[in-house]
From Swiss-Prot:
This is Putative calmodulin-like protein 2. Pfam families: EF-hand_7 (PF13499). The gene is CML2. A lipid is attached at C173, C174 (S-palmitoyl cysteine). The keyword Ligase does not apply. It is a lipid-anchor. It comes from Oryza sativa subsp. japonica (Rice).
Length: 183
């Protein structure tokens, strides 16, 4: 969370305090429900508890400010990553028709110095092409790239880590000179 500015932390503190109705330094599922209700949402108690559990790193049953900060920092990181992924998609989608065809994928990977065999191309398409139409649309590309990014972060490579092994490049990373090396 050291990448958040003092201004962002101050804004997030204000937001946290709006949720923390009783001022005890934690957000309970009940407090979360109150705020969501004021925003026109009506989640069930079970849904509220699940939301709290997803953020509650220490298992206390409520959300402390540090946990709240962690959630918001992840959301900010994911937003920036999606912009980079969108740009990478544009690079792959040579004719800008909204789809990456097998030929476009093969062409870009070859230009990145990583030509694909027929089997490797088939594997990449199989992994990404969830609707089975033989090409990759933006949502399919985004899903695969965000999953790769999360996997890399969990493996300790952070958002700037890039491994140069061919197996990694062929499973989602776009190469050292590409805008998607942050993945």
């Amino acid at each position: 969370m050291d990448h958040l500015t003092k201004e962002q932390i101050a804004e997030f503190r204000e937001a946290f305090n709006l949720f923390d109705k009783d001022g005890d330094g934690t957000i309970t599922s009940k407090e979360l429900g109150t705020v969501m209700g004021s925003l026109g949402q009506s989640p069930t108690e079970a849904e509220l508890k699940k939301m709290v559990e997803e953020v509650d790193a220490d298992g206390s049953g409520s959300i402390e400010f540090e946990e709240f900060l962690g959630l918001l920092a992840r959301k900010l990181r994911d937003t920036g990553a999606e912009d980079d992924i969108r740009e990478a998609f544009r690079v792959f989608d040579k004719d800008q028709n909204g789809f990456i065809t097998p030929d476009e994928l093969r062409h870009v990977m070859a230009n990145l110095g990583d030509p694909l065999s027929d089997d490797e191309l088939a594997d990449m398409l199989h992994e990404a092409d969830s609707d089975g139409d033989g090409q990759i649309n933006y949502n399919e590309f985004l899903k695969v790239m965000m999953a790769k990014r999360r996997q890399n972060m969990m493996e300790g490579h952070g958002s700037g880590g890039h491994r140069s092994s061919n197996s990694h490049k062929k499973s989602g990373c776009c190469g050292p000179n590409s805008s998607c090396t942050i993945l």
